[in-house]
């Protein structure tokens, strides 16, 4: 098949392209590089802001100068309802252009959108980065983020894309929960995040030493979305009760290759407080045998049909700090528990997230 992937979210489309290409499909990836990630792409949609508003013309030129690749595809998958770095009105026009000139359009449910915020405000899922304990939370920190997606032109764009796509694909259980409504259920599919799994020799069982090495990735401007510093405070509290047994390293802004080496060396990674399920960052750690503190709700394991593996130290914002600390402490200091979770982490990523298996599901 001839396939066009538009937009990028944490290398999802790049990794999927590799899997689809290996299966014999002809795949083109068109994106702006996902901001600072600067991920690879075949058609570059990045705006050169030296040109101000005129930089949008460059984006349109790059699209229309590649019409043989942009048109006539069997499948076009959009990473979100806005998929080119232009305002909502232009995204709306581009959606209808792609729908008219290609056979099938898939909307990816991979990121923020107006419906996601509407569902979160109604308590779906039970907790998120904007809602827990039956009420909205973090609203001041999230005000601009929500505003960006709820302006009238963006709501109209979302409506056109969501209601007129041939299918919707959610990459996370919480996104699937939000879209599993009578309006979308018949067209909705869950397909997990694709990953290039490191060779078996790159993974090692963690938690074997006397000292537990904990890695905390810091994103100060985004911590209201992730909650990593709150989890780190839980770990610090546990560390004070066990002097000399826990070593915590904070890291910010290191190159990707160095960060991967740090994941290899760590026993435990602090990830996200507000998520139900593992993120791409979590999966990169788990594939290396590093145990993750983050989202691993039983509802998620039941949803994917996993009866045995429970590799994640599950923390959540809607319980007390003391309960979260107890969960971490038990995982760290119950004999053999970290090693078991490390083994299960490797098995879990290979079972559900190998990019070749994910490409087959697509």
What are these regions (language model features)?
Residues 176-254:
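Conserved catalytic-core segment of nucleotide-activated headgroup transferases in glycan assembly
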Residues 291-300:
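Short hydrophobic beta-strand element within catalytic cores of glycosyltransferases
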Residues 64-71, 93-100, 104, 130-168:
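Membrane-proximal helix-turn-helix segments that form the acceptor-binding/catalytic region
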Residues 264-277, 290:
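Acidic donor-binding loop of glycosyltransferase active sites
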Residues 39, 46, 107-152, 221, ...:
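Acceptor-binding helix/loop patch of EC 2.4 sugar-transfer enzymes
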Residues 333-362:
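A charged, aromatic-enriched C-terminal amphipathic alpha-helix characteristic of glycosyltransferases
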Residues 117, 145-188, 233:
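A short, active-site helix/loop in glycosyltransferases that binds the activated sugar's phosphate group
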